[in-house]
C-alpha cells in the first residue's frame, strides 16, 4: 500500500512514527498546498520522515511526494461522482477499502494531527481520525469549499479557509499556503522582475 521517500541522510535513521499526516491529493490542486505545509514543518525543525502523506494511487502524489523527500502511503480507489452509475458503485467499494486501510494506518501510527486537503483519500483519513479521536484540520483552497471537505468538516477540530465567507464550521481565515519563492517574487520591483525574465526595460509587455 504505498511508497516512501526520504533524503539520503534520513534513510539511515531508524523508522520513525509520523508526527503529522497530510491527507489528500488526486490532483495537484489538492497536493501542492500540502507540500508547502510539509516544507514549513521541516523549516520549523520536524524531520521529513515524521511528515507522512496519504494519497491516491492514481494521483500525482505517487511521484511528487517522494521526489520532495517525504514518505507517502497510497490508497486504492477513486473519487465518487454525483450521478448513480456502475462506475460509482465500484468507486464506493474502493472508498470503503481505502477507509479500512486508512483506519489501520492511523491506529498503528497515532499521529498528533491529520491535515485533510480534499479528494477521496482525505475523506478516508478524516473519517478515521474522527473515529480514533485524532485532531483533524480541514484546509480548503477555494472560495466555495469542495464536496470532500464539506463532508468531513463536521468532524474537524478547525477548518483553514483561503477566503472569507467559506461555509465550513469552525473556520479560521488563513489564506492559501504559498511557496517561499512565489512570495519572494511578489516583492520584486518591476525593473527586477523584467531583469529576472530577460525582458527589455523600455518595452510594453
Label for each model-derived stretch:
Residues 1-55:
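N-terminal subdomain of nucleotide-sugar transferases
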Residues 17-23, 47-97, 174-179:
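Conserved nucleotide-sugar phosphate-binding/catalytic loop shared by glycosyltransferases and other
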Residues 52, 60, 130-191:
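Active-site-proximal region of nucleotide-activated glycan assembly enzymes
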Residues 59-63, 113-132:
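An aromatic- and histidine-rich active-site surface loop
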Residues 87-89, 184-199:
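A short helix/loop element that forms part of the nucleotide-sugar donor recognition site in Leloir-type
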Residues 90-105, 192:
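Glycine-rich, highly charged phosphate/nucleotide-binding loops
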Residues 102-121, 137-139:
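Short N-terminal targeting/anchoring amphipathic segment
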Residues 200-205:
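Conserved donor-binding/catalytic core segment of Leloir-type glycosyltransferases
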